[in-house]
Protein backbone atom coordinates (compact mmCIF):
# COMPACT_ATOMS: atom_id res chain seq x y z
CA UNK A 1 0.00 0.00 0.00
CA UNK A 2 1.53 3.32 -1.09
CA UNK A 3 1.29 6.25 1.30
CA UNK A 4 0.98 9.78 -0.20
CA UNK A 5 3.94 12.04 0.54
CA UNK A 6 1.73 14.64 2.24
CA UNK A 7 0.07 12.02 4.47
CA UNK A 8 0.10 12.54 8.22
CA UNK A 9 2.07 9.34 8.66
CA UNK A 10 5.08 10.79 6.80
CA UNK A 11 5.41 13.90 8.96
CA UNK A 12 8.14 14.43 11.54
CA UNK A 13 7.27 16.10 14.85
CA UNK A 14 10.62 15.85 16.64
CA UNK A 15 11.50 18.99 18.65
CA UNK A 16 15.22 18.73 19.38
CA UNK A 17 15.30 21.74 21.72
CA UNK A 18 12.74 20.10 23.99
CA UNK A 19 14.68 16.83 23.95
CA UNK A 20 17.81 18.70 25.05
CA UNK A 21 15.92 20.35 27.93
CA UNK A 22 14.40 17.05 28.98
CA UNK A 23 17.81 15.34 28.94
CA UNK A 24 18.99 17.62 31.76
CA UNK A 25 16.54 16.01 34.16
CA UNK A 26 17.02 12.33 33.31
CA UNK A 27 18.70 9.90 35.67
CA UNK A 28 21.67 9.38 33.32
CA UNK A 29 22.37 13.12 33.03
CA UNK A 30 22.13 13.59 36.79
CA UNK A 31 24.58 10.75 37.38
CA UNK A 32 27.11 12.15 34.90
CA UNK A 33 26.64 15.66 36.27
CA UNK A 34 27.32 14.52 39.84
CA UNK A 35 30.49 12.70 38.77
CA UNK A 36 31.96 15.98 37.49
CA UNK A 37 31.48 17.77 40.81
CA UNK A 38 34.54 17.80 43.06
CA UNK A 39 33.46 17.63 46.70
CA UNK A 40 36.00 18.86 49.30
CA UNK A 41 36.14 19.30 53.04
CA UNK A 42 38.20 21.85 54.97
CA UNK A 43 39.50 22.50 58.49
CA UNK A 44 38.65 26.16 57.87
CA UNK A 45 38.19 28.50 54.92
CA UNK A 46 41.97 28.90 54.31
CA UNK A 47 43.08 25.32 54.78
CA UNK A 48 41.17 22.90 52.52
CA UNK A 49 41.79 19.23 52.99
CA UNK A 50 41.17 16.66 50.25
CA UNK A 51 39.86 13.77 52.25
CA UNK A 52 39.18 10.37 50.75
CA UNK A 53 35.76 9.53 52.07
CA UNK A 54 34.51 5.96 51.80
CA UNK A 55 30.79 6.16 51.01
CA UNK A 56 28.56 4.36 53.45
CA UNK A 57 26.49 1.52 52.22
CA UNK A 58 22.94 2.75 51.80
CA UNK A 59 20.35 1.08 53.98
CA UNK A 60 16.71 0.68 53.10
CA UNK A 61 14.39 2.95 54.97
CA UNK A 62 12.37 1.50 57.80
CA UNK A 63 8.66 1.07 57.46
CA UNK A 64 6.86 1.43 60.78
CA UNK A 65 4.26 -1.11 59.68
CA UNK A 66 6.93 -3.77 59.21
CA UNK A 67 8.58 -3.40 62.60
CA UNK A 68 7.87 -5.84 65.37
CA UNK A 69 8.99 -9.17 66.78
CA UNK A 70 6.74 -11.67 65.03
CA UNK A 71 6.60 -10.07 61.57
CA UNK A 72 10.16 -10.97 60.43
CA UNK A 73 9.74 -14.49 61.87
CA UNK A 74 6.38 -15.34 60.29
CA UNK A 75 6.56 -13.28 57.10
CA UNK A 76 8.41 -15.73 54.86
CA UNK A 77 6.64 -18.91 56.05
CA UNK A 78 3.28 -17.19 55.55
CA UNK A 79 4.26 -15.95 52.11
CA UNK A 80 5.48 -19.42 51.08
CA UNK A 81 2.22 -20.98 52.32
CA UNK A 82 0.09 -18.37 50.54
CA UNK A 83 1.96 -18.82 47.25
CA UNK A 84 1.73 -22.59 47.54
CA UNK A 85 -2.05 -22.43 48.02
CA UNK A 86 -2.35 -19.85 45.24
CA UNK A 87 -0.40 -22.04 42.82
CA UNK A 88 -2.50 -25.10 43.61
CA UNK A 89 -5.79 -23.22 43.17
CA UNK A 90 -4.52 -21.65 39.92
CA UNK A 91 -3.71 -25.12 38.58
CA UNK A 92 -7.25 -26.33 39.37
CA UNK A 93 -8.66 -23.17 37.80
CA UNK A 94 -6.81 -23.77 34.53
CA UNK A 95 -8.08 -27.36 34.46
CA UNK A 96 -11.66 -26.13 34.89
CA UNK A 97 -11.27 -23.55 32.11
CA UNK A 98 -9.87 -26.28 29.87
CA UNK A 99 -12.92 -28.44 30.65
CA UNK A 100 -15.29 -25.56 29.80
CA UNK A 101 -13.54 -24.90 26.47
CA UNK A 102 -13.67 -28.58 25.53
CA UNK A 103 -17.34 -28.79 26.57
CA UNK A 104 -18.27 -25.86 24.35
CA UNK A 105 -16.17 -26.98 21.39
CA UNK A 106 -17.26 -30.63 21.26
CA UNK A 107 -20.84 -30.39 22.57
CA UNK A 108 -22.19 -26.92 21.75
CA UNK A 109 -20.36 -25.93 18.57
CA UNK A 110 -21.14 -28.76 16.18
CA UNK A 111 -22.42 -29.04 12.62
CA UNK A 112 -24.16 -25.96 11.24
CA UNK A 113 -23.53 -23.94 14.39
CA UNK A 114 -19.77 -24.42 14.04
CA UNK A 115 -19.88 -23.43 10.35
CA UNK A 116 -21.82 -20.22 11.07
CA UNK A 117 -19.52 -19.37 13.95
CA UNK A 118 -16.44 -19.80 11.77
CA UNK A 119 -17.92 -17.49 9.15
CA UNK A 120 -18.60 -14.91 11.86
CA UNK A 121 -14.99 -15.09 13.09
CA UNK A 122 -13.67 -14.60 9.55
CA UNK A 123 -15.62 -11.38 8.91
CA UNK A 124 -13.33 -8.49 7.91
CA UNK A 125 -15.80 -5.58 7.97
CA UNK A 126 -18.55 -4.60 10.39
CA UNK A 127 -21.22 -4.88 7.71
CA UNK A 128 -20.08 -8.40 6.90
CA UNK A 129 -19.91 -9.31 10.58
CA UNK A 130 -23.41 -7.98 11.28
CA UNK A 131 -24.95 -9.97 8.42
CA UNK A 132 -23.37 -13.19 9.70
CA UNK A 133 -24.29 -12.41 13.31
CA UNK A 134 -27.95 -12.12 12.29
CA UNK A 135 -27.70 -15.51 10.58
CA UNK A 136 -26.35 -17.02 13.81
CA UNK A 137 -29.14 -15.36 15.83
CA UNK A 138 -31.70 -16.82 13.47
CA UNK A 139 -30.18 -20.29 13.80
CA UNK A 140 -30.34 -20.21 17.61
CA UNK A 141 -33.86 -18.72 17.68
CA UNK A 142 -32.79 -15.39 19.18
CA UNK A 143 -35.13 -13.42 16.92
CA UNK A 144 -38.13 -14.61 18.92
CA UNK A 145 -36.41 -13.47 22.12
CA UNK A 146 -35.94 -9.98 20.67
CA UNK A 147 -39.64 -9.61 19.89
CA UNK A 148 -40.75 -10.50 23.43
CA UNK A 149 -40.28 -7.38 25.63
CA UNK A 150 -40.31 -9.35 28.89
CA UNK A 151 -36.89 -9.74 30.52
CA UNK A 152 -35.81 -9.68 34.15
CA UNK A 153 -32.74 -7.48 33.60
CA UNK A 154 -34.61 -4.26 32.77
CA UNK A 155 -37.91 -2.57 33.68
CA UNK A 156 -39.81 -3.34 30.49
CA UNK A 157 -43.12 -1.97 31.79
CA UNK A 158 -41.54 1.43 32.53
CA UNK A 159 -39.70 1.55 29.20
CA UNK A 160 -42.90 0.62 27.33
CA UNK A 161 -44.89 3.34 29.11
CA UNK A 162 -42.29 6.05 28.45
CA UNK A 163 -41.89 4.98 24.83
CA UNK A 164 -45.65 5.27 24.27
CA UNK A 165 -45.69 8.71 25.93
CA UNK A 166 -42.84 10.00 23.76
CA UNK A 167 -44.57 8.87 20.57
CA UNK A 168 -47.93 10.30 21.68
CA UNK A 169 -46.66 13.76 22.72
CA UNK A 170 -44.40 14.14 19.68
CA UNK A 171 -47.17 13.25 17.22
CA UNK A 172 -49.65 15.52 19.01
CA UNK A 173 -46.99 18.29 19.21
CA UNK A 174 -47.59 18.69 22.92
CA UNK A 175 -44.13 20.15 23.55
CA UNK A 176 -44.54 20.90 27.26
CA UNK A 177 -45.64 17.34 27.96
CA UNK A 178 -42.78 16.04 25.79
CA UNK A 179 -40.28 18.09 27.79
CA UNK A 180 -41.67 16.66 31.04
CA UNK A 181 -41.20 13.10 29.79
CA UNK A 182 -37.69 13.85 28.50
CA UNK A 183 -36.75 15.31 31.89
CA UNK A 184 -37.60 11.95 33.42
CA UNK A 185 -36.11 9.51 30.90
CA UNK A 186 -32.93 11.19 29.62
CA UNK A 187 -30.63 9.80 32.27
CA UNK A 188 -28.01 7.11 32.57
CA UNK A 189 -29.30 3.53 32.67
CA UNK A 190 -32.94 4.60 32.71
CA UNK A 191 -35.10 1.54 33.32
CA UNK A 192 -31.98 -0.63 33.12
CA UNK A 193 -31.48 -0.16 29.36
CA UNK A 194 -27.70 0.24 29.86
CA UNK A 195 -27.47 -3.24 31.37
CA UNK A 196 -24.91 -5.33 29.51
CA UNK A 197 -27.18 -8.37 29.98
CA UNK A 198 -29.60 -6.89 27.42
CA UNK A 199 -26.91 -7.30 24.77
CA UNK A 200 -25.53 -10.61 26.06
CA UNK A 201 -28.36 -12.85 24.83
CA UNK A 202 -27.84 -12.20 21.11
CA UNK A 203 -25.00 -11.76 18.67
CA UNK A 204 -26.51 -8.62 17.16
CA UNK A 205 -28.95 -6.13 18.66
CA UNK A 206 -31.20 -6.55 21.67
CA UNK A 207 -34.90 -6.37 22.60
CA UNK A 208 -36.97 -4.65 19.92
CA UNK A 209 -38.63 -2.54 22.62
CA UNK A 210 -35.24 -1.17 23.71
CA UNK A 211 -34.21 -0.42 20.11
CA UNK A 212 -37.55 1.30 19.43
CA UNK A 213 -37.21 3.34 22.63
CA UNK A 214 -33.67 4.52 21.75
CA UNK A 215 -34.76 5.43 18.22
CA UNK A 216 -37.78 7.37 19.48
CA UNK A 217 -35.65 9.19 22.05
CA UNK A 218 -33.28 10.13 19.24
CA UNK A 219 -36.14 11.49 17.12
CA UNK A 220 -37.51 13.53 20.03
CA UNK A 221 -34.13 15.11 20.81
CA UNK A 222 -33.57 15.90 17.13
CA UNK A 223 -36.99 17.54 17.03
CA UNK A 224 -36.15 19.72 20.04
CA UNK A 225 -32.83 20.72 18.46
CA UNK A 226 -33.88 21.28 14.84
CA UNK A 227 -37.25 22.96 15.30
CA UNK A 228 -36.12 25.22 18.16
CA UNK A 229 -39.29 24.63 20.16
CA UNK A 230 -38.11 26.51 23.25
CA UNK A 231 -36.31 29.74 24.00
CA UNK A 232 -32.52 29.75 24.04
CA UNK A 233 -32.47 29.96 27.84
CA UNK A 234 -34.97 27.10 28.26
CA UNK A 235 -33.11 24.96 25.75
CA UNK A 236 -29.77 25.65 27.42
CA UNK A 237 -31.09 24.68 30.85
CA UNK A 238 -32.79 21.61 29.41
CA UNK A 239 -29.65 20.19 27.79
CA UNK A 240 -27.49 21.06 30.79
CA UNK A 241 -29.92 19.02 32.87
CA UNK A 242 -29.84 16.17 30.35
CA UNK A 243 -26.05 16.17 30.27
CA UNK A 244 -25.75 16.10 34.05
CA UNK A 245 -28.13 13.15 34.37
CA UNK A 246 -27.01 11.20 31.31
CA UNK A 247 -23.29 11.65 31.92
CA UNK A 248 -20.44 11.03 29.57
CA UNK A 249 -18.86 7.96 28.01
CA UNK A 250 -15.14 7.31 28.44
CA UNK A 251 -12.84 5.11 26.39
CA UNK A 252 -10.18 3.52 28.59
CA UNK A 253 -7.08 2.00 26.98
CA UNK A 254 -5.19 -0.30 29.33
CA UNK A 255 -1.49 -1.00 29.57
CA UNK A 256 0.15 -4.26 28.60
CA UNK A 257 3.51 -3.38 26.96
CA UNK A 258 3.38 -4.29 23.24
CA UNK A 259 0.02 -6.03 23.81
CA UNK A 260 -1.42 -2.49 24.03
CA UNK A 261 -0.86 -2.11 20.28
CA UNK A 262 -4.05 -4.18 19.86
CA UNK A 263 -5.88 -0.98 20.84
CA UNK A 264 -5.17 0.24 17.30
CA UNK A 265 -7.78 -2.14 15.90
CA UNK A 266 -10.30 -1.17 18.59
CA UNK A 267 -9.83 2.49 17.72
CA UNK A 268 -10.13 1.77 14.00
CA UNK A 269 -13.46 -0.04 14.46
CA UNK A 270 -14.85 2.82 16.59
CA UNK A 271 -13.55 5.44 14.15
CA UNK A 272 -15.18 3.76 11.15
CA UNK A 273 -18.56 4.01 12.91
CA UNK A 274 -17.85 7.50 14.33
CA UNK A 275 -18.18 6.17 17.88
CA UNK A 276 -14.95 7.33 19.55
CA UNK A 277 -15.95 9.05 22.83
CA UNK A 278 -14.55 12.48 23.64
CA UNK A 279 -13.20 11.43 27.05
CA UNK A 280 -10.24 9.10 26.60
CA UNK A 281 -7.81 7.74 29.15
CA UNK A 282 -4.69 5.70 28.61
CA UNK A 283 -2.18 4.00 30.85
CA UNK A 284 1.28 2.73 29.95
CA UNK A 285 1.18 1.49 26.33
CA UNK A 286 -2.47 2.53 26.07
CA UNK A 287 -1.44 6.10 26.87
CA UNK A 288 0.61 6.26 23.66
CA UNK A 289 -2.43 5.48 21.49
CA UNK A 290 -4.73 7.66 23.62
CA UNK A 291 -2.36 10.56 22.93
CA UNK A 292 -2.43 9.76 19.20
CA UNK A 293 -6.23 9.91 19.14
CA UNK A 294 -6.53 13.08 21.23
CA UNK A 295 -4.03 15.09 19.18
CA UNK A 296 -5.49 14.24 15.75
CA UNK A 297 -8.78 14.90 14.01
CA UNK A 298 -10.89 12.10 12.57
CA UNK A 299 -9.56 12.70 9.06
CA UNK A 300 -5.98 12.50 10.29
CA UNK A 301 -6.71 9.33 12.25
CA UNK A 302 -8.01 7.61 9.13
CA UNK A 303 -4.53 8.05 7.65
CA UNK A 304 -2.77 6.85 10.81
CA UNK A 305 -4.64 3.79 12.09
CA UNK A 306 -3.13 1.55 9.42
CA UNK A 307 -0.38 -1.12 9.44
CA UNK A 308 2.18 1.42 8.16
CA UNK A 309 2.01 3.11 11.57
CA UNK A 310 4.47 0.38 12.67
CA UNK A 311 7.34 2.48 11.29
CA UNK A 312 6.67 5.10 13.98
CA UNK A 313 7.23 2.60 16.78
CA UNK A 314 10.79 1.96 15.63
CA UNK A 315 13.47 3.53 17.80
CA UNK A 316 17.21 3.13 18.03
CA UNK A 317 17.21 1.00 21.17
CA UNK A 318 19.71 -1.54 19.85
CA UNK A 319 19.67 -5.29 20.32
CA UNK A 320 19.36 -7.35 23.49
CA UNK A 321 23.08 -6.96 24.21
CA UNK A 322 22.80 -3.17 24.06
CA UNK A 323 19.71 -3.28 26.27
CA UNK A 324 21.53 -5.46 28.82
CA UNK A 325 24.49 -3.07 28.94
CA UNK A 326 22.11 -0.15 29.36
CA UNK A 327 20.32 -1.93 32.21
CA UNK A 328 23.54 -2.44 34.20
CA UNK A 329 24.58 1.14 33.49
CA UNK A 330 21.28 2.95 34.17
CA UNK A 331 19.01 0.38 35.83
CA UNK A 332 16.56 0.36 32.89
CA UNK A 333 16.29 -1.43 29.56
CA UNK A 334 15.19 1.65 27.58
CA UNK A 335 16.65 5.11 27.26
CA UNK A 336 14.36 8.00 28.22
CA UNK A 337 15.56 10.30 25.42
CA UNK A 338 14.97 7.72 22.70
CA UNK A 339 11.53 7.05 24.15
CA UNK A 340 10.76 10.77 24.12
CA UNK A 341 11.77 11.01 20.47
CA UNK A 342 9.45 8.12 19.59
CA UNK A 343 6.57 9.53 21.63
CA UNK A 344 6.82 12.95 19.98
CA UNK A 345 5.29 11.61 16.80
CA UNK A 346 2.29 10.15 18.62
CA UNK A 347 1.76 13.37 20.61
CA UNK A 348 2.23 15.61 17.55
CA UNK A 349 5.38 17.19 18.89
CA UNK A 350 5.40 18.93 22.25
CA UNK A 351 1.68 19.66 22.53
CA UNK A 352 0.40 20.28 26.03
CA UNK A 353 -2.84 18.82 27.37
CA UNK A 354 -4.62 22.18 27.00
CA UNK A 355 -3.38 22.61 23.41
CA UNK A 356 -4.50 19.11 22.44
CA UNK A 357 -7.95 19.74 23.90
CA UNK A 358 -8.30 23.00 21.97
CA UNK A 359 -7.19 21.30 18.76
CA UNK A 360 -9.45 18.23 18.79
CA UNK A 361 -12.08 18.71 21.51
CA UNK A 362 -11.10 15.36 23.00
CA UNK A 363 -10.18 15.14 26.67
CA UNK A 364 -6.94 13.19 27.13
CA UNK A 365 -6.21 11.60 30.51
CA UNK A 366 -2.94 9.84 31.39
CA UNK A 367 -2.64 7.84 34.62
CA UNK A 368 0.68 8.00 36.51
CA UNK A 369 1.85 7.34 40.06
CA UNK A 370 4.67 9.04 42.02
CA UNK A 371 7.90 7.07 42.31
CA UNK A 372 7.51 6.66 46.08
CA UNK A 373 5.37 3.88 47.49
CA UNK A 374 2.63 5.69 49.39
CA UNK A 375 1.76 8.82 47.36
CA UNK A 376 -1.63 8.65 45.60
CA UNK A 377 -2.01 8.16 41.83
CA UNK A 378 -2.40 11.21 39.60
CA UNK A 379 -4.63 11.64 36.56
CA UNK A 380 -3.05 14.13 34.15
CA UNK A 381 -5.43 16.10 31.90
CA UNK A 382 -6.14 19.62 30.69
CA UNK A 383 -7.77 20.55 34.02
CA UNK A 384 -5.23 19.14 36.49
CA UNK A 385 -2.08 19.93 34.45
CA UNK A 386 -2.95 22.06 31.41
CA UNK A 387 0.64 23.08 30.54
CA UNK A 388 2.19 19.64 30.99
CA UNK A 389 3.73 18.30 27.78
CA UNK A 390 1.87 15.16 26.73
CA UNK A 391 4.88 13.07 25.73
CA UNK A 392 6.42 13.42 29.20
CA UNK A 393 3.22 12.08 30.80
CA UNK A 394 3.12 9.19 28.31
CA UNK A 395 6.73 8.24 29.07
CA UNK A 396 6.07 8.43 32.81
CA UNK A 397 3.03 6.20 32.40
CA UNK A 398 5.24 3.65 30.61
CA UNK A 399 7.98 3.76 33.25
CA UNK A 400 7.85 0.25 34.68
CA UNK A 401 10.75 -0.22 37.13
CA UNK A 402 13.59 -2.05 35.42
CA UNK A 403 12.19 -1.23 31.97
CA UNK A 404 12.22 2.57 32.06
CA UNK A 405 13.36 4.82 34.89
CA UNK A 406 10.82 7.14 36.56
CA UNK A 407 10.91 10.61 35.00
CA UNK A 408 9.69 14.10 35.91
CA UNK A 409 6.72 15.53 34.06
CA UNK A 410 7.76 18.45 31.87
CA UNK A 411 5.77 21.70 31.80
CA UNK A 412 5.79 24.55 29.28
CA UNK A 413 6.88 27.75 31.07
CA UNK A 414 6.02 31.37 30.27
CA UNK A 415 9.13 31.66 28.10
CA UNK A 416 8.16 28.40 26.32
CA UNK A 417 11.01 26.48 27.94
CA UNK A 418 10.43 23.01 29.35
CA UNK A 419 10.81 22.81 33.11
CA UNK A 420 9.99 19.99 35.56
CA UNK A 421 6.46 19.83 36.91
CA UNK A 422 5.81 19.52 40.65
CA UNK A 423 9.38 20.46 41.69
CA UNK A 424 10.91 17.65 39.67
CA UNK A 425 9.08 14.83 41.44
CA UNK A 426 9.39 11.66 39.36
CA UNK A 427 6.51 9.50 38.17
CA UNK A 428 6.10 5.96 36.84
CA UNK A 429 3.63 3.49 35.32
CA UNK A 430 0.07 4.17 36.48
CA UNK A 431 -1.07 0.61 35.73
CA UNK A 432 0.80 -0.59 38.82
CA UNK A 433 -2.11 0.82 40.85
CA UNK A 434 -4.79 2.38 38.61
CA UNK A 435 -4.90 0.86 35.16
CA UNK A 436 -8.51 2.02 34.64
CA UNK A 437 -9.13 5.25 36.69
CA UNK A 438 -12.94 5.16 36.60
CA UNK A 439 -13.53 6.92 39.94
CA UNK A 440 -11.38 9.90 38.90
CA UNK A 441 -13.13 10.11 35.54
CA UNK A 442 -16.53 10.14 37.19
CA UNK A 443 -15.47 12.87 39.62
CA UNK A 444 -13.81 15.15 37.07
CA UNK A 445 -15.87 14.56 33.91
CA UNK A 446 -19.18 13.01 35.03
CA UNK A 447 -18.40 9.70 33.32
CA UNK A 448 -21.27 7.21 33.77
CA UNK A 449 -20.45 4.73 31.01
CA UNK A 450 -17.06 3.19 30.26
CA UNK A 451 -15.65 1.30 27.30
CA UNK A 452 -12.51 -0.55 28.39
CA UNK A 453 -10.09 -2.02 25.87
CA UNK A 454 -8.15 -4.45 28.04
CA UNK A 455 -4.88 -6.00 26.84
CA UNK A 456 -3.01 -6.79 30.07
CA UNK A 457 -1.98 -10.44 29.67
CA UNK A 458 -1.62 -11.08 33.40
CA UNK A 459 -5.33 -10.51 34.12
CA UNK A 460 -6.85 -12.01 31.00
CA UNK A 461 -7.25 -15.39 32.65
CA UNK A 462 -9.54 -13.86 35.29
CA UNK A 463 -12.08 -12.57 32.76
CA UNK A 464 -14.78 -15.15 32.35
CA UNK A 465 -18.48 -14.46 31.81
CA UNK A 466 -20.52 -17.50 32.92
CA UNK A 467 -23.73 -16.01 31.42
CA UNK A 468 -22.14 -14.59 28.28
CA UNK A 469 -20.93 -11.12 27.43
CA UNK A 470 -21.97 -8.35 25.03
CA UNK A 471 -22.32 -9.80 21.54
CA UNK A 472 -21.16 -13.25 22.68
CA UNK A 473 -24.08 -15.08 24.28
CA UNK A 474 -23.99 -18.50 25.89
CA UNK A 475 -25.03 -20.92 23.17
CA UNK A 476 -25.93 -23.64 25.68
CA UNK A 477 -29.74 -23.91 26.11
CA UNK A 478 -30.29 -21.00 23.66
CA UNK A 479 -28.68 -18.44 25.92
CA UNK A 480 -30.44 -19.50 29.10
CA UNK A 481 -27.69 -21.83 30.27
CA UNK A 482 -24.24 -21.43 31.75
CA UNK A 483 -20.89 -21.77 30.04
CA UNK A 484 -19.68 -25.33 30.55
CA UNK A 485 -22.94 -26.11 32.34
CA UNK A 486 -23.85 -24.85 35.79
CA UNK A 487 -21.28 -27.04 37.55
CA UNK A 488 -18.41 -25.86 35.34
CA UNK A 489 -19.28 -22.19 35.87
CA UNK A 490 -19.80 -22.67 39.61
CA UNK A 491 -16.37 -24.27 40.01
CA UNK A 492 -14.80 -21.47 37.95
CA UNK A 493 -16.32 -18.78 40.16
CA UNK A 494 -15.32 -20.55 43.38
CA UNK A 495 -11.70 -21.07 42.30
CA UNK A 496 -11.31 -17.56 40.87
CA UNK A 497 -12.48 -15.86 44.04
CA UNK A 498 -10.33 -18.19 46.12
CA UNK A 499 -7.27 -17.01 44.15
CA UNK A 500 -8.32 -13.40 44.72
CA UNK A 501 -8.65 -14.17 48.44
CA UNK A 502 -5.03 -15.34 48.64
CA UNK A 503 -3.85 -12.28 46.72
CA UNK A 504 -5.67 -10.08 49.25
CA UNK A 505 -4.02 -11.97 52.12
CA UNK A 506 -0.57 -11.40 50.60
CA UNK A 507 -1.25 -7.68 50.18
CA UNK A 508 -3.02 -7.07 53.50
CA UNK A 509 -0.31 -8.79 55.56
CA UNK A 510 2.44 -7.06 53.50
CA UNK A 511 4.13 -10.36 52.73
CA UNK A 512 5.34 -9.41 49.26
CA UNK A 513 8.82 -7.84 48.95
CA UNK A 514 9.26 -4.54 47.13
CA UNK A 515 11.82 -5.20 44.39
CA UNK A 516 13.06 -2.06 42.62
CA UNK A 517 11.37 -0.01 45.35
CA UNK A 518 7.89 -0.73 44.01
CA UNK A 519 4.78 -2.16 45.64
CA UNK A 520 3.56 -4.79 43.15
CA UNK A 521 0.65 -6.06 45.26
CA UNK A 522 -2.05 -4.13 43.36
CA UNK A 523 -1.13 -5.46 39.93
CA UNK A 524 -3.79 -8.22 40.17
CA UNK A 525 -6.25 -6.55 42.54
CA UNK A 526 -7.43 -3.50 40.61
CA UNK A 527 -10.66 -3.01 38.71
CA UNK A 528 -9.77 -3.92 35.13
CA UNK A 529 -13.20 -3.89 33.48
CA UNK A 530 -15.88 -1.35 32.60
CA UNK A 531 -19.48 -1.21 31.42
CA UNK A 532 -18.19 -2.76 28.20
CA UNK A 533 -14.88 -4.62 28.18
CA UNK A 534 -13.19 -5.42 24.88
CA UNK A 535 -10.65 -8.26 24.85
CA UNK A 536 -8.66 -8.48 21.59
CA UNK A 537 -7.65 -12.06 20.88
CA UNK A 538 -3.90 -12.32 21.38
CA UNK A 539 -1.41 -14.98 20.34
CA UNK A 540 1.04 -16.87 22.54
CA UNK A 541 3.99 -15.67 20.44
CA UNK A 542 3.11 -12.09 21.39
CA UNK A 543 4.97 -12.72 24.64
CA UNK A 544 8.20 -13.04 22.66
CA UNK A 545 7.69 -9.51 21.29
CA UNK A 546 6.35 -8.03 24.52
CA UNK A 547 9.00 -5.27 24.59
CA UNK A 548 9.61 -5.01 20.85
CA UNK A 549 8.10 -2.65 18.26
CA UNK A 550 5.71 -4.28 15.76
CA UNK A 551 6.41 -4.99 12.12
CA UNK A 552 3.94 -3.93 9.44
CA UNK A 553 2.65 -7.52 9.22
CA UNK A 554 2.20 -7.88 12.99
CA UNK A 555 0.45 -4.53 13.28
CA UNK A 556 -1.87 -5.54 10.44
CA UNK A 557 -2.83 -8.67 12.36
CA UNK A 558 -3.29 -6.66 15.57
CA UNK A 559 -5.61 -4.20 13.83
CA UNK A 560 -7.73 -7.05 12.44
CA UNK A 561 -7.86 -8.75 15.87
CA UNK A 562 -8.81 -5.50 17.62
CA UNK A 563 -11.59 -4.81 15.13
CA UNK A 564 -12.93 -8.36 15.39
CA UNK A 565 -13.13 -8.01 19.19
CA UNK A 566 -14.94 -4.67 18.87
CA UNK A 567 -17.60 -5.62 16.31
CA UNK A 568 -19.86 -7.44 18.86
CA UNK A 569 -19.88 -4.36 21.12
CA UNK A 570 -20.78 -1.72 18.53
CA UNK A 571 -24.58 -2.07 18.81
CA UNK A 572 -24.43 -1.41 22.55
CA UNK A 573 -21.96 1.47 22.13
CA UNK A 574 -24.03 3.05 19.34
CA UNK A 575 -27.21 2.97 21.44
CA UNK A 576 -25.43 4.93 24.15
CA UNK A 577 -23.36 7.30 21.98
CA UNK A 578 -26.26 8.30 19.72
CA UNK A 579 -28.11 9.96 22.61
CA UNK A 580 -24.94 11.41 24.14
CA UNK A 581 -23.93 13.11 20.88
CA UNK A 582 -27.36 14.69 20.52
CA UNK A 583 -27.13 16.04 24.06
CA UNK A 584 -23.70 17.52 23.29
CA UNK A 585 -25.08 19.04 20.09
CA UNK A 586 -27.93 20.62 22.04
CA UNK A 587 -25.52 22.09 24.58
CA UNK A 588 -23.31 23.56 21.86
CA UNK A 589 -26.19 25.39 20.13
CA UNK A 590 -26.21 28.33 22.51
CA UNK A 591 -22.52 28.21 23.46
CA UNK A 592 -20.43 29.10 20.42
CA UNK A 593 -17.16 28.65 22.30
CA UNK A 594 -13.95 27.65 20.56
CA UNK A 595 -13.10 25.46 23.50
CA UNK A 596 -14.03 21.84 23.04
CA UNK A 597 -14.34 21.93 19.24
CA UNK A 598 -12.12 20.13 16.77
CA UNK A 599 -10.32 22.29 14.22
CA UNK A 600 -12.25 20.48 11.49
CA UNK A 601 -15.56 21.06 13.29
CA UNK A 602 -16.50 17.38 13.24
CA UNK A 603 -16.12 16.51 16.91
CA UNK A 604 -16.03 18.23 20.24
CA UNK A 605 -17.02 18.21 23.86
CA UNK A 606 -19.10 21.05 25.19
CA UNK A 607 -18.69 22.14 28.78
CA UNK A 608 -20.72 24.07 31.29
CA UNK A 609 -20.01 27.77 31.74
CA UNK A 610 -18.08 27.01 34.92
CA UNK A 611 -15.96 24.40 33.15
CA UNK A 612 -15.12 26.87 30.38
CA UNK A 613 -14.08 29.56 32.86
CA UNK A 614 -11.89 27.11 34.78
CA UNK A 615 -10.28 25.89 31.55
CA UNK A 616 -9.57 29.43 30.37
CA UNK A 617 -8.07 30.40 33.71
CA UNK A 618 -5.94 27.24 33.83
CA UNK A 619 -4.70 27.75 30.28
CA UNK A 620 -3.69 31.34 31.07
CA UNK A 621 -1.52 30.31 34.02
CA UNK A 622 1.95 29.31 32.88
CA UNK A 623 4.68 28.41 35.37
CA UNK A 624 7.65 30.71 35.70
CA UNK A 625 11.15 29.62 34.76
CA UNK A 626 12.70 28.09 37.86
CA UNK A 627 15.64 25.82 38.33
CA UNK A 628 14.90 22.54 40.04
CA UNK A 629 17.62 21.29 42.37
CA UNK A 630 18.15 17.58 41.70
Swiss-Prot record:
Enzyme class: hydrolase
Protein name listed in UniProt: Triacylglycerol lipase ptl2
Gene that encodes it: ptl2
Species the sequence originates in: Schizosaccharomyces pombe (strain 972 / ATCC 24843) (Fission yeast)
GO molecular function term, any single one: triacylglycerol lipase activity
Job description of the protein: Lipid particle-localized triacylglycerol (TAG) lipase. The lipid droplet/particle is a lipid storage compartment which serves as a depot of energy and building blocks for membrane lipid biosynthesis. Involved in the mobilization of the non-polar storage lipids triacylglycerols (TAGs) from lipid particles by hydrolysis of TAGs, releasing and supplying specific fatty acids to the appropriate metabolic pathways.
Record-level GO cellular component terms: cytoplasm; lipid droplet
InterPro entries for the chain: Acyl_Trfase/lysoPLipase (IPR016035), NTE (IPR050301), PNPLA_dom (IPR002641), Triacylglycerol_lipase_N (IPR021771)
Active-site residues, Swiss-Prot/TrEMBL: 284 (nucleophile), 429 (proton acceptor)
SUPFAM superfamilies noted in UniProt: FabD/lysophospholipase-like
Family: Belongs to the PLPL family.
Location relative to the cell: Lipid droplet
Domain spans labelled PNPLA: 251-442
Amino acid sequence: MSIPEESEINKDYTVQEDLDEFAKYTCVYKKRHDEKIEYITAQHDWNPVYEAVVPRKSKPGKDEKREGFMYPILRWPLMFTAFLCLTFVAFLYLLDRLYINCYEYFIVWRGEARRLRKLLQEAKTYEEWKERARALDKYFGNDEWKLDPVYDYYDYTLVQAVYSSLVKHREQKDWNALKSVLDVCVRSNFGGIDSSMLYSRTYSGTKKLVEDYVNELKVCLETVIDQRLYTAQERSKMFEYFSHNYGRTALCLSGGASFAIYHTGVLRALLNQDLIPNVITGTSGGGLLAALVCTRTNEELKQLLVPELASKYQSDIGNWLDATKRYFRTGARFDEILWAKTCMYFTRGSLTFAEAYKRTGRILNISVIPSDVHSPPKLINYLTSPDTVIWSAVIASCAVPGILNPIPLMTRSQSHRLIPHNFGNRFKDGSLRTDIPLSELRTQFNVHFSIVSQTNPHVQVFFFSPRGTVGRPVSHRKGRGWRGGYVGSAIEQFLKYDMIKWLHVIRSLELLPRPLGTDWSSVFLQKFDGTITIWPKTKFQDFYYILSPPSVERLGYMIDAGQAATFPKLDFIAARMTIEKLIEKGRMMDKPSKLGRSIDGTIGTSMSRGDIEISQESASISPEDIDIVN
